[in-house]
Amino acid sequence: MNPFKMRPERTGDLFVDWEKFWVKPYNKNEVNPYTRTRIILMNGTEFENVWFSHQFSRSVGDDELRRKLAYIRKSEQQQQKILTHLKPADESALEHTIGYEQLAVDLTAHLAKRVNDKNIKSALDFALLEDFDHLYRYADYLDFTTGEHAEKLVGGYTEITPGRPTISHHRHPYDSIRYPMTDKCPATMDVLAANVITAAEQQTMNYYMNTAALWPDEMGRRLYQEIGMVEEQHVTQYGSLLKPCMSRLENLLVHQYVECWLYWSCYETETDTRIRGIWQFMFEQE
């Protein structure tokens, strides 16, 4: 797949009507676990693109550029809303959290196997041990509070096992800063991986920031609060890997390229025919 060689949709077709805007949620008892993680991943990717676009727009005085950013951003917002509403109302926040941590473990491990930059691989390997711990602790909390086994939610695809103990996760903020990519032309896979994992971990961080206060018991609130602080460290670590000398426009191009790659990847691997159609539609938009 090379989005630079594919004919794009006309920009007038980027917006969808209200009927197409509304989507039926997946069935939480039947959904493939990786369908859930794909939805979480792309939700976070769209969130990152929307807020990057907002920050870009606020930092430039070119009104024509700001209009184009606003135009694309509305489409990104529609995509994000569609993805958000694929989650069913009867899937609890804790069940959904298991999906977040399954994504963290499997995505981090997958990217670590594919990157070329040893510094990026080291960052991924380091955080992976903490992602395993987070999945294990949330699974334990799910079993304790509801009797539900997280192994069913992850479909047996992801091992639920202790990782680095959470007490060892808390570090001084300075220690979360890694060396950024400084090569003039870093490997495309390295650029993609660093941007993908930053957006994914940022989505997890934001989810925990807003979920912690929902829990009626102190144990749950403390759990989300503590792991949420670790996610801040992960986002700081991954964000520090990004190439700092890129212009805003270059970064905008990378953000759009990341979306193309991920939507294509989701389409290629999706097993749910209806959801696969959504990935195809959004890939064509990108």
What are these regions (language model features)?
Residues M1-E286:
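Non-heme di-metal
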